[in-house]
């Protein structure tokens, strides 16, 4: 049986330099390889024509580019596209392409499933199977047909990015480095429930935007909706955020799904104003998308507008996020590959 080759895709410049040294290739070959990967986006090592034939053959013995196309796609009536990817371990993940008038955003996954078990999220109901490598995360960007149209990237797909932060930070380095994609960090937003072990490290090691899943300003209620609150509370998250400056390039936002009869009254808006006082941020209000076996409901637009207007009038910039891809289960909280995982015989935790 042939030994699987190691993917070059998802490797940082430092890692490529180590590979080059190990193979006895000239030092400058590392930047040639990263250029072929992240600028020209080749599919095979044979296409790296400024490497000598000898060095290409040496590289091919143990390595491959490692790009793999989606195995399935679903298209929404609103233009949103949901892509299904199979990982080398035969796990399944989803990514969502969201075109808009002057923007094109890709929502990527960082894990197969998720440990956080948020009450309102289908990925959380799926349970956790595996972390994704930098290769598997970057492949979602590398391998969609619309990759050259992308203006923005959000880590809001399957999984908790801070629970797989080593790999997420590698991807962010590749995307924002001169040797990689060369993107501005302002094009990228990472969303998290706010894990303590990852929050400060992310803020210190990355300049990308941060989105915190709040969903209620009341800790006792947040514990019911989001078990992660038990380990690290929303008030502790806010305490840490006060130590950072979000008034310049990096943007801080709070995600707030509005549930009927749960967190939709202006009492909650008032508490949000108190909680966020002194922090430069915005609140994104999100309509709840019903998922199976969850006894939560969304609210009407009138309620959303009243909530937004209260926040704005009291000094907290707020927006209502447009729902996209609901008809193909691609909207916020609706991603799940539980069906595919079950069909291949994976035991979900």
From Swiss-Prot:
Active site per the UniProt annotation: 94, 332
An example of a Gene Ontology cellular component annotation for this protein is:
cytoplasm
The UniProt record gives the binding positions of S-adenosyl-L-methionine as: 159-160, 191, 213-215, 289
What superkingdom does the record give? Answer: Bacteria
Residue span, Radical SAM core domain: 100-321
Q: Which InterPro entries match?
A: Aldolase_TIM (IPR013785), Methyltransferase_A (IPR040072), RlmN_N (IPR048641), RNA_MTrfase_RlmN (IPR027492), rRNA_lsu_MTrfase_RlmN/Cfr (IPR004383), rSAM (IPR007197)
Q: Does the keyword Protein biosynthesis apply?
A: no
Q: Which reaction does it catalyse?
A: adenosine(2503) in 23S rRNA + 2 reduced [2Fe-2S]-[ferredoxin] + 2 S-adenosyl-L-methionine = 2-methyladenosine(2503) in 23S rRNA + 5'-deoxyadenosine + L-methionine + 2 oxidized [2Fe-2S]-[ferredoxin] + S-adenosyl-L-homocysteine; adenosine(37) in tRNA + 2 reduced [2Fe-2S]-[ferredoxin] + 2 S-adenosyl-L-methionine = 2-methyladenosine(37) in tRNA + 5'-deoxyadenosine + L-methionine + 2 oxidized [2Fe-2S]-[ferredoxin] + S-adenosyl-L-homocysteine
Q: Does the keyword Methyltransferase apply?
A: yes
* EC numbers, comma separated: 2.1.1.192
Residues that hold [4Fe-4S] cluster according to the record: 114, 118, 121
Its Gene Ontology biological processes? rRNA base methylation; tRNA methylation
**Described purpose of this protein according to its UniProt entry:** Specifically methylates position 2 of adenine 2503 in 23S rRNA and position 2 of adenine 37 in tRNAs.
UniProt record similarity statement: Belongs to the radical SAM superfamily. RlmN family.
Entry protein name:
Probable dual-specificity RNA methyltransferase RlmN
